[in-house]
Regions:
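Short coil/turn connectors at secondary-structure junctions
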Residues: 26-28, 52-55, 82-87, 174-175
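Short beta-strand segments
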Residues: 33, 58-61, 91-93, 181-182
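Conserved N-terminal catalytic core of the sugar/cofactor nucleotidyltransferase
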Residues: 1-58, 65-66
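Short, conserved catalytic or adaptor-binding loops enriched in Gly and charged residues
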Residues: 16-27, 111-116, 170-172
Length: 222
């Protein structure tokens, strides 16, 4: 609000328009602080008073998802949830020799991109020869409000942490949970190389700076 007011007073209306268009007018931003790093499940639980009785999405900000079509993956997950009331866990295919680095979903078959299939569970970093599939959890979830109560009752694990995957496993006792295979591309910005990859991919596609960015890359003569 202070930035917007300052830009308006200085009559920098182009910058003001750029700032105000970042967030749609019907969207409100509320920050909730996680006082201690006690796991993803605990972080989600911290937002219980804000979420209330609403179903909700969880998006991990260190994973960027670049959409490959006009209809983005998160929209398709929400649509599937609305149609079936089945929770949605976004997954992507990874090379077989890398499955021991990820949380891998247990499914009867591999769905096509943009489609969902019921999952039996999530196996954390399985051995390569014992992995139930090659579909790794990406960091996008569509979940029902009831998962908050399950998180409250989830036993704490190593490091006194509450894990979201444990609450999802408890949810599967009564509800269908599906793995949604994404169509887009992910960038793990939790790693330095993943962050640099994201900068490159988003840079060349930037509507204003993309062409100049491509020219800069050519100048490097890599």
């Amino acid at each position: 609000f202070e930035l917007e007011t300052t830009l308006e007073h200085k009559k920098k209306f182009d910058l003001l328009k750029e700032i105000t268009e970042i967030l749609p007018p019907h969207v409100s931003v509320i920050s909730v602080r996680q006082p201690q790093p006690l796991g993803l499940g605990h972080a989600v639980l911290c937002a219980k008073s804000v979420v209330g009785d609403d179903d909700f999405a969880v998006l991990l900000p260190d994973v960027l998802v670049k959409d490959s079509s006009e209809t983005n993956d998160l929209s398709l997950m929400i649509q599937r949830f609305d149609e079936t009331h089945a929770s949605q866990i976004m997954v992507e295919a990874v090379p077989d020799h890398m499955v021991d680095q990820y949380g891998i979903v247990d499914v009867a078959s591999i769905p096509a991109e943009g489609h969902s299939i019921q999952m039996q569970g999530i196996v954390e970093k399985p051995a390569v020869d014992a992995a139930p599939s090659n579909l790794s959890v990406v960091g996008r979830y569509i979940l029902p409000a009831k998962i908050m109560q399950l998180l409250e009752n989830t036993p704490k694990g190593a490091g006194n942490e509450i894990q979201l995957t444990d609450a999802i496993a408890a949810l599967q006792a009564t509800d269908t949970v599906e793995a949604y295979r994404m169509k887009g591309q992910t960038f793990d910005c939790g790693s330095k190389l993943g962050y640099l990859k994201a900068v490159l991919h988003y840079g060349v596609d930037h509507p204003k700076l993309g062409e100049e960015f491509k020219a800069l890359i050519k100048e490097l003569k890599l």
